Every structure is written in C-alpha cells, then in structure tokens.
Amino acid sequence: MGGINMEDNKKTIFSGIQPSGNLTIGNYFGALKNWVKLQDEYNCFYCIVDLHAITVRQVPQELRKRTLEVLAVYIASGLDPEKNTLFIQSHVPAHTEAAWLLNCFTYLGELNRMTQFKDKSQNAGESISAGLLNYPVLMAADILLYNADLVPVGNDQKQHLELTRDIATRFNNLYSPTFKVPEPYIGKTGARIMDLQEPKKKMSKSAENKNGYILIMDPPNIIQNKINRAVTDNEGIVRYSDEQPGVKNLMNILSTATGKNVESIEKEYAGLGYSKFKKDVAEAIIAEVEPLQKEVKRYLEDKSYLEKVYKEGAQKASYVANKTLSKMKRKIGFVLDK
C-alpha cells in the first residue's frame, strides 16, 4: 500500500476539528500549533470531523466550503501531508460502522451524564438529535480505529476521552485485547484560549457575542478592535492571576504568539496599564495569522491539490481503520465478507 508510512517505533496520535464554523485563534494556538510540533515524533492522524458537525443542522454548501477551508488551514499551519494522515471523516466509512458497534457496548446512563450533552440539550428541548447524544461514541470510534496512544484534547473533551477509555476497556475485557486504551495529550502552552468577553469560558466560534472570539481569517482592523474591547478589569496591572481572568487570557495569547513566558510579560508591562499591552497582543496575533491567511487563500485556490491530499489521506486512514474494524467484527462474532 503505497504512501502508508506507519513507523512501528512511534506512538500514534489522533485528533480532529469540526468544520462547523470558521476556525478561531483558539483552534490555532490551542491545537494546531501543538499538532505541528508533534508530527516528527508521532504517527499522526488529523481528521476534519464532518460527521460530528451534523449533530446540529448545517447548510450543505457552507459545510462543503468549510470542510475544505479546515483542510487548507491544517496545511497552511504547517501540517505536512507527507508526514501526517490528513483526511475527511466521512470519507472513511469505518467510522460510522465502528460507532454503531461501540454504541452496543455503551450504556445510556453514561451518555446522559456527559456534561457537554447536558449543556447543549438544555435549550434544545424536543429538537435535540440522537446524534448529539451519541457524539462521544463516534469520537470513541474515531480514536480506537487508529489504536491511538495519545489524543490531544482540551478540558472540554476530557470527559469524552474518559468514556472512550471505558468503552475500550469494556470491549477488551469482554472479548480479548483489541484496542489500545488512549491517554490524553495536553500541550504545555496554549491549551486553553478563553472567550474575550467571558474569559471563564473557552473561546468558541459558536459564541453569541462575535467580540468574544477572533477568527484565523479576521483582518487586522477587526483583530485590533476585538482585543481593544476584550474584558479586563479596573486594576490596570498586567498580572497572571486567576482573579484577573481577562488579563490572564490576553497574557496566554501573547505568550503563545511570541514564545515569551508570562513572568517576562509581567515585567515588560509593569506600570504600563492595559493600552500598550492590548496593542501588543493584537500586533502579535496579526503577525502570526497574516502569513497563515495568505497560505490558506493560496491552497483554497488550488482545489486539485486539496483533493489529492484528502483522497490520499482517506486511503491511508481506511487502510488502518478497516483492519481494526475487521478485528472488532471477528471478535463480536460476525461472519466476515472476505
């Protein structure tokens, strides 16, 4: 199978991002920059999880557009298609098949206890989809199909990864060792970029207040305006403290964008107030995203290249996923078709 370069001595990593909206600097600083650092050390599978995106209604043409945009952002961020398996989730049917199988080894009570489901279903009433309830099982399938050793996750996904571990252990105990039980990988920096207006919440593209997030593709003037409006406090002191969540968040952003540690940032802005600090945070973000934006636009203009990447990625992913799926079916007791 040409192009499948799974090095046995390397551990495997799986992660993905939903194409359910434009990506934020939270995605970039919190996930993508860390992923790039991992690509030489691990066998990496990075997915665009479009099956997860449809747990809430999507406009079809927008979903198609954003799926390619996420792929372009992956590559523009520095994820090399030669070093990583970059693919679209729906192009590998093993994900949905494995999700059904794992559903049969997951308890309803476990899914009802998922905090994210409870939060999202509160306002949805009867319109909540079964897909949203089963979302963590599909996530388990995503991870277990590739025998991932490590999964880069934010705090909001830790509970889902715990469920993945429980499902894998349950299946292994019921039959025989089949899956690796994955561990979380949490990056040392940028693991959690918060909302600019509600700094106790994670930055999210689904936030109601557009001033709460900065998109990777936002122009410089918008970035400057959003940082200027970012919530701080009346202290006027640049200090890394849980009692100043807005300032702490801006310091995290500046630290991740520039590589400076928070101690040196505190010293640099001692006695200067927030005006210069905010200006420099905005400039640091712009310096990071402007070259990225040019690369994203360049890749989006070359649809044939993106098609080549996602087709080769799906082929490589399918090769690995189908082997795991066949093993699952055999252990469960299905008659295999080949």
Swiss-Prot record:
SUPFAM superfamilies: Nucleotidylyl transferase. Coiled coil: none annotated. ATP binds at Q18, P19, S20, G26, N27, G154, N155, D156, I193, K202, M203, S204, K205, S206. CDD domains: TrpRS_core. GO terms for cellular component: cytosol. Pfam families: tRNA-synt_1b (PF00579). It comes from the Bacteria. A motif ('KMSKS' region) lies at residues 202-206. A motif ('HIGH' region) lies at residues 19-27. L-tryptophan binds at D142. Keywords: Aminoacyl-tRNA synthetase, ATP-binding, Cytoplasm, Ligase, Nucleotide-binding, Protein biosynthesis. GO terms for biological process: tryptophanyl-tRNA aminoacylation. It catalyses: tRNA(Trp) + L-tryptophan + ATP = L-tryptophyl-tRNA(Trp) + AMP + diphosphate + H(+). GO terms for molecular function: ATP binding; tryptophan-tRNA ligase activity. It is found in: Cytoplasm. Its EC number is 6.1.1.2. InterPro entries: aa-tRNA-synth_I_CS, aa-tRNA-synth_Ic, Rossmann-like_a/b/a_fold, Trp-tRNA-ligase, Trp-tRNA-ligase_bac-type, Trp-tRNA_synthetase. Catalyzes the attachment of tryptophan to tRNA(Trp). Belongs to the class-I aminoacyl-tRNA synthetase family. PANTHER family: TRYPTOPHAN--TRNA LIGASE, MITOCHONDRIAL. Homodimer. This is Tryptophan--tRNA ligase.
